[in-house]
Amino acid sequence: MKKHKGLKTIGKILAVILVFLLVINIIPPKKNVENNPFLVAKGELPMIAAHRGGGDNNPENTMLAFREAVNTIGVDIIESDLYLTKDGYLVYNHDSYIDETCNVNGDISLEEVEALCEIKENRHYIKDMTLAELEKYNFGYYFEDENGARIYKDVTDLEGTGLQIATVDKLFEEFYESNPDLLFIVEIKNSGELGYEACRILYETLNRYPEYKDQIVIGTFHDEIEEELKANYADLMRGAPTGTAAKFVITQFLGVNIFDNSDFACLQIPTSYDLGIEVYLDKETIIKRAHRRNIAVQYWTINDADGMRELIELGCDCIMTDNPELLKSVLEEYK
């Protein structure tokens, strides 16, 4: 008899839990943002984001790459990282130092540069250089075409060819009139005081190009910069930092998304995380639950055609890639 009562009790508890989960998944969750330009309509193909401007196709983070990505390939989004120079300019570069993307060390091989940079004191950090100093160097110096040829190594007209380091201001100015619908994903890489200053300068720059203010999403891996953006630049859209993204994904897997109180606009994630075991994030459920809250789901960094097809068929909003030419050709298969 006691055994039957125990089973009934367990059954009631499970029923309550089931009803609870059902109810909280029926209740419409609050929208993180009302108008999100990074969302695609149901049934539409994902946007193309040129990661670092499309570093497989052209020298990464240069105006040459950005122009080719927008004007020739027709990407929807430019994605890159931002660093602050010594004299207060925001420039695009993946690393905090420039050695591996330009000829700051003279005519030596990339292998020699990498060996040199193993010692941090040998590196040329952006924060220690002025814009004028940075603009002297060829940021296409080590780029190789599909045949392995360094086709920009001997270019002398760096400004004319777009091989100088690129500033945020120059990029916005380039496309503001011709491409008013262009979208931007940026990551502020500086931390602490430099990161705060980077936020301020980016905001001031956006005030000079107001139409782009609603077309940019900003990310950071630094908690203090995330708090700065939330506190002082709340009108700008933010991407989910790692911890927030993890919390969101976990609540979606558990079906308790109503308890997630985050306010980011874009969920930027890889297709999987290695946490001792491989956790796969290329799931339709994640995308659907994000869409219920007006969150765009953007996957990085996808450079193979099969991976692109998988995400297209899942219904994601954006694929970030080093090879936007390839992604464009894959998307043509679905038209």
What are these model-derived regions, one by one?
Residues 2-335:
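Phosphate-group recognition and catalysis centered on beta-loop-alpha active-site segments
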